Every structure is written in structure tokens, then in C-alpha cells.
């Protein structure tokens, strides 16, 4: 997991010089290829792009390099999958939407504690975070549009997305309430998770 130029903030797109990233990525692939030959390392050794999910701006250069070299890549998707679970619950409406709103309320109330361990990989403007009362009044569509990583949606809010990305502990503390709703809303949650991983990530990379 080499350190690349630019910022890899949690849950949002890459911020930096894409051309410089491409150069560094290709250089690292060359180093791995040489190391495999020189030191007998496993031939399937892969680069790990830490916090690489949702970094759509650099997927083109990564895809190009992988196709040209036959190399592999390890992309961590736990965080983006958690957010799609939350979007799926909001899409389901009813108790699912209420839980999603409750997660936001608790995350906002505990923002300092939740954000502190991730200070170097988030960039949240608190002035851009709606109040919990405002979010309580949102429709299912409003919640989804704010959170879903689609920059063509005018209401997409990267600050909300980053806060909820690091707010997974709120859902963990909910325990069975959260897990049971995931099961009850499995169809819509699975649809969102699958579309995100396959359409936005795998198809763009491979």
C-alpha cells in the first residue's frame, strides 16, 4: 500500500494531480514486477490502493495500467459498502429511513469523536452539514441524493458522506436494530451494494 500523491479522503473522489498519480502508480507496478523477478515473491502480488474506493477520477489511469501490464490491484470497499447499506435502508423507507436519519443524528452529535481518528483522511466543512432536525424532515429521495456518490446529482453532499463514512460505529452500537433491518430490507440494500461495487468500481477498473 504505497503512499500516492494527492488526498484519498474517505468515501469521496480523489483530490490531486491525476497525471502525477498515474506516473507514480505505473512506477510502483514496475517496482513490483522487478521485485517478483528478483526476490521470488508471489507472481500474484498486488498493489493496494489504500482508501481507493470511490476515487473515480483515477480509475481510468488504473484501468489502463492494469490492462497494459496484466497486474492486479487490491481495493478496499468496506466503507463504501457500509454507505450503500445506509442508502438502501433510506430507499426502503419506513423504519429503514428512520434508522438512517437516527444514524445521522448520532453521527452529527458525536462528530468530533468519530472524526478524530480519521483527521488526515477526511475534509469536512461543518458549515455544509445540515442539522439533524433538517435531515429528520427529508424524504427517502432527499437522503439518498445527499449520500449517494454521484456528483451529477445537485444535492450530493460530500461532507455528509464523509461524516457518515466514519459514523459506522453508530450503526454498530445499534446492534440488532440495524442488523434486523438489513435483513428485512435485504433486496433493496443488496441492489444498492451490488450496483455500487459492480457498476461504479469493478466495471471502471477492469
Question: Where on the chain are the PLM-derived regions?
Answer:
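Active-site capping/gating regions of soluble enzymes
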Residues: 1-206
Amino acid at each position: 500500500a504505497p503512499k500516492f500523491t494527492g488526498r484519498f479522503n474517505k468515501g469521496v473522489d480523489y483530490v490531486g494531480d491525476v497525471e502525477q498519480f498515474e506516473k507514480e502508480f505505473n512506477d510502483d507496478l514496475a517496482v513490483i514486477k522487478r521485485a517478483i523477478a528478483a526476490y521470488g515473491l508471489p507472481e500474484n502480488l498486488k498493489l493496494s490502493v489504500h482508501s481507493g474506493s470511490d476515487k473515480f477520477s483515477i480509475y481510468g489511469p488504473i484501468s489502463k495500467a492494469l490492462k497494459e501490464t496484466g497486474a492486479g490491484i487490491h481495493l478496499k470497499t468496506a466503507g463504501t459498502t457500509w454507505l450503500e447499506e445506509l442508502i438502501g435502508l433510506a430507499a426502503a423507507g419506513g423504519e429503514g429511513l428512520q434508522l438512517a436519519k437516527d444514524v445521522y443524528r448520532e453521527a452529527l452529535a458525536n462528530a468530533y469523536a468519530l472524526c478524530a481518528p480519521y483527521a488526515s483522511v477526511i475534509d469536512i466543512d461543518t458549515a455544509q452539514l445540515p442539522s439533524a432536525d433538517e435531515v429528520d424532515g427529508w424524504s427517502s429521495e432527499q437522503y439518498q441524493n445527499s449520500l449517494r456518490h454521484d456528483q451529477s446529482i445537485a444535492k450530493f453532499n460530500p461532507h455528509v458522506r464523509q461524516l457518515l463514512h466514519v459514523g459506522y460505529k453508530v450503526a454498530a452500537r445499534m446492534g440488532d436494530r440495524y442488523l434486523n433491518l438489513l435483513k428485512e430490507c435485504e433486496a433493496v440494500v443488496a441492489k444498492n451494494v451490488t450496483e455500487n461495487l459492480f457498476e461504479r468500481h469493478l466495471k471502471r477498473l477492469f
